UniProtKB/Swiss-Prot annotation:
Pfam families: zf-C3HC4_3 (PF13920), zf-CCCH (PF00642). This is Pre-mRNA-splicing factor CWC24. One of its GO terms (molecular function) is zinc ion binding. Associated with the spliceosome.
Length: 232
């Protein structure tokens, strides 16, 4: 006996084998889809009922708030605000000044257009009061008279000025004028020859006018080059 039955496949008019068509049960499919939708709606409604709002929190609404106090509206319109809040919560410090500087703090500058300068020191470079003088000992004018080349030479050579050179006045102390035929005493102080001899002969004061040492009327002439070295 034959175990299997023979199947006869119909051929189309062209001679090709026609594929069998499957029939779908449309009524059953629609009923199944309706059942699935009903189950999903029931489960979603039950889930919403289970979640209760926490005390102190507002329910979300679709009303958009306008202004600076709006939190939901700004968050929806500007997503960058959400990033800023997350950055602050992460602990990042804000950049820039937190508070403006106080208005009470102001800077004031005072310029003295008429300073109290010692007249004797300005004219002659010597003052009898010394460091105890209450006026300023400034030699701005004498500094401007110096040539630039000599200042540059002193900077390059880095020579330390002697105390004797610092104490030499650039004008005669007796007449308050430039030196005319200058002379130097034993104590290395400069005077005009006329002023020194007038003080020694007429006033009969043999002591030095600056240091008070007895000179005995002895002095030595000073050349122009030596005078420039002593004054500069």
């Amino acid at each position: 006996m034959a175990m299997f039955k023979k199947r006869f496949i119909k051929k189309s008019e062209d001679g090709k084998v026609a594929k069998p068509k499957r029939k779908l049960d449309v009524d059953g499919f629609e009923s199944d889809s309706d059942d699935v939708l009903e189950k999903e709606t029931k489960s979603s409604s039950q889930g919403i009922k289970k979640h209760k709002p926490i005390n102190g929190t507002k329910k979300p609404t679709r009303d958009v708030e306008h202004g600076q106090n709006s939190s939901t509206g700004n968050a929806l319109s500007n997503p960058s605000l959400d990033q800023a809040t997350t950055d602050k919560s992460a602990g990042e410090k804000s950049v820039g000044p937190i508070k403006p500087p106080p208005i009470s703090i102001k800077t004031t500058t005072i310029t003295d257009f008429q300073p109290d300068v010692c007249k004797d020191f300005l004219q002659t470079g010597y003052c009898g009061y010394g460091d105890t003088c209450k006026f300023l000992h400034i030699r701005d004018e004498s500094k401007q008279r110096k040539p630039i080349e000599k200042e540059w030479e002193t900077v390059t050579e880095q020579q330390k000025p002697d105390k004797s050179k610092e104490q030499v006045p650039y004008r005669c102390v007796l007449c308050s004028k430039d030196y005319t035929s200058p002379v130097k005493t034993e104590c290395n102080h400069l005077f005009c020859q006329k002023c020194f001899m007038n003080r020694y002969r007429n006033l009969k004061k043999p002591n030095c006018f600056i240091c008070g040492k007895d000179t005995g009327g002895v002095c030595s002439p000073v050349s122009k080059k030596e005078l420039e070295k002593l004054i500069s």
